[in-house]
Regions:
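Transmembrane and membrane-interface helices of multi-pass
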Residues: 1-149
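Soluble catalytic regions of membrane-associated enzymes that act on cell-envelope
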Residues: 153-176
Length: 176
């Protein structure tokens, strides 16, 4: 099975940002980051695949890295929010959280690479998850764009023509 998640998972955060800021961001602004994210994922796949036999396992490791990488800031912010006092904030400093994420990455990578079975089921699951996430985000973006076009069309359809304006011959008495 083709690891479609290798291309889709890196663009999920980009699409998420676009879907929350669709009124501000143009498609030209999204193209370059999209190209960079996808080409870096493909570069990692091509480079790391030289050292391992299974390209599907390497794709899962790269996807695992992207998931951890893009979720780090959210988890860090959430933990800071939970532990509000200055004493407890020591638990969520980067020097403590980065090693935890590093260990999570190494454990996940080790498990994926050392499993003797072919990971078709896991690849299918991650592919379906990535397709669903991208589909939801694209649906949000497209529905907003379409609703914007419909609102523009409605506004343009209600324009007042100069011939529709009635000009009164008698001026109002503003001085009483």
């Amino acid at each position: 099975m083709f690891p479609l998640h290798l291309v889709l998972i890196p663009i999920i955060p980009l699409l998420l940002l676009v879907s929350h800021n669709v009124d501000i961001v143009s498609l030209q602004d999204v193209f370059l980051p999209f190209l960079i994210l996808v080409s870096v994922a493909i570069f990692f796949q091509a480079t790391i695949s030289r050292f391992f036999k299974s390209k599907a396992k390497v794709a899962l490791v790269i996807s695992w890295f992207y998931i951890l990488f893009f979720s780090y800031g959210h988890i860090h912010g959430y933990l800071n929010q939970i532990m509000g006092s200055s004493i407890l904030e020591l638990a969520v400093q980067n020097r403590y959280l980065v090693p935890i994420f590093g260990i999570l990455f190494l454990l996940g990578s080790f498990c994926v690479l050392k499993i003797k079975k072919i990971l078709d089921v896991l690849t299918k699951f991650v592919n379906v998850w990535a397709v669903v996430m991208v589909s939801i985000l694209l649906f949000n973006i497209v529905s907003y764009v379409i609703s914007g076009f419909l609102q523009q069309e409605k506004i343009l359809g209600l324009e007042i023509e100069p011939k529709d304006i009635e000009i009164s011959k008698s001026l109002p008495d503003i001085y009483y």
